Design a protein with these regions (language model features):
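C-terminal regulatory/interaction regions
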Residues: 2-38, 318-386
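Conserved beta-strand hairpin/beta-sheet module of binuclear metal-dependent hydrolase folds
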Residues: 46-110, 237-254
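Short Pro/Gly-enriched beta-strand edge/turn motifs at strand-loop
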Residues: 52-60, 192-199, 219-221
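A short catalytic or substrate-binding loop motif that flags glycine-/basic-rich loops and adjacent residues
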Residues: 65-67, 208-210, 229-232, 386
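Short aromatic-enriched loop/helix-cap "lid" or pocket-rim segments at secondary-structure transitions
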Residues: 69-71, 157-162, 258-260, 304-305
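Metallo-beta-lactamase
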Residues: 82-95, 196-207, 215-217, 222-317
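Active-site HxH/HxHxD metal-binding segment of metal-dependent hydrolases
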Residues: 96-98, 102-216, 244, 300
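Histidine-centered divalent metal-coordination motifs
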Residues: 120-126, 149, 229-231, 235, ...
Length: 386
């Protein structure tokens, strides 16, 4: 949803990554009204589910962030001769989410077990409880296995051990390079080394690999894995041609733009270009596809939403480039250009990653060039005058 304080055209959603807070509830924006929501304002209550297609149910769990919920999915399944359910995404590991899942297990599964857990990507709200659900539903004879891309399984293992990510010494040094020089803020970033592990204390030791182009049969229906890049290392969306449904994960969201960040372990990455290229692949799906996003309501209008997201990023790229033409700018200098609202520490870490992503895309395009100063800070200069 656009930032209410933004002066940007309503047709271009404001730059709110999925991990940053959505603006307060209010009238739908022009961008949002261009989409069709077949379920209207219907939402599943916590611990309950809502059918969105035959054999496919919607579960909604709370998150302790300003973006206060995640959508999870139950798919009726038959696996290795056993009747049950496949769960897509899990929520973070906390007592409230476990309690909500227990309600789902008791009242929404028709007395059947969870057979496997598919995770779209390694972010905490998606993989956090994968270890608990798979352990809870595994038996001596049959494992309830985690299915995930290999890249994201390895990334989750590292992050749960405090390696990489948006906190700790490496992150603080990376943010300082890009102009975040406030000592108090950097000290707080250094203390966030265990932030991911607090929501994902454990990742299943074994998994089954999802990869681009793989067809997974769930309940007799084929689901094609579509890899996407830029938001996570190897995000997997699931498309059912027969049902006309796309479980988009975080790749396409109806109200906010997906967070696309550069992280310190891959400091020169051009993740925004990867993300935009991934959206182009999703554009080729049928126009009437029902999109089941991880945040927000199920919607139709996939191509329209992709157009909006691309226009949004093109506008932000132009603004970032103009700022660098006016004077050499750090990524931190660009925060008030790209995010016209007050950011707390949690939001600032994601916003810094996204600001770097935008200047790196401009760098790839030859529109800016880096200049490392004697102060140890990197500034970006436009290659041509404004």
């Amino acid at each position: 949803m656009p930032d209410p304080s933004s002066t940007r055209p309503a047709a271009v959603p404001a730059a709110l990554p999925a991990d940053l807070p959505a603006a307060p509830s209010g009238p739908a924006s022009a961008a949002e009204t261009a989409l069709h929501y077949p379920l209207g304002d219907s939402l599943p209550q916590v611990g309950c589910s809502l059918e969105v297609a035959p054999g496919l149910r919607w579960v909604r769990m709370a998150l302790p962030f300003a973006l206060d919920h995640i959508n999870l999915w139950l798919l009726r399944d038959r696996l290795d001769g056993r009747e049950g359910w496949t769960v897509v995404d899990c929520g973070i590991d906390d007592e409230a989410t476990r309690a909500a899942w227990e309600q789902v297990f008791s009242h929404e599964l028709q007395g059947l077990p969870v057979l496997r857990v598919l995770v779209t990507h390694m972010h905490p709200d998606h993989i956090g409880l994968a270890h608990w659900i798979t352990e809870r539903w595994s038996t001596a004879d049959q494992a309830c296995r985690l299915w995930i891309s290999s890249t994201d399984w390895h990334a989750a293992q590292m992050a749960s051990q405090g390696i990489g990510g948006a906190g700790g010494d490496m992150a603080a040094d990376f943010f300082r390079l890009h102009g975040l020089v406030d000592a108090a803020v950097l000290a707080q970033v250094r203390q966030r080394r265990g932030h991911y592990a607090g929501m994902v204390p454990q990742v299943p030791a074994r998994y089954r690999r999802l990869m681009d182009g793989l067809d997974v049969a769930i309940g007799g229906t084929g689901w094609r894995c579509l890899a996407g890049y830029g938001h996570a290392p190897e995000h997997i969306s699931l498309h059912s041609p027969a049902q006309g449904v796309l479980i988009s994960g975080d790749m396409v969201l109806p109200r906010v733009s997906t967070n696309v960040s550069v992280y310190p372990m891959e400091p020169e990455a051009d993740v925004l270009t990867l993300f935009l290229n991934s959206l182009e692949r999703l554009r080729t799906l049928p126009a009437g596809t029902l999109v089941l996003p991880s945040h927000g309501r199920p919607f139709r209008g996939l191509q329209t939403r992709i157009d909006q997201l691309q226009a949004h990023h093109e506008a932000r790229l132009a603004e970032a480039r103009d700022a660098c033409a006016a004077r050499p700018s750090t990524a931190a200098d660009l925060l008030p250009v790209l995010f016209r609202r007050t950011l707390d520490l949690h939001q600032t870490t994601f916003a810094m990653g996204e600001a770097v992503a935008h200047v790196h895309a401009l760098w790839t395009q030859g529109r800016v060039t880096p200049e490392d100063g004697r102060d140890g800070v990197r500034r970006w200069r436009a290659t041509t005058p404004a």
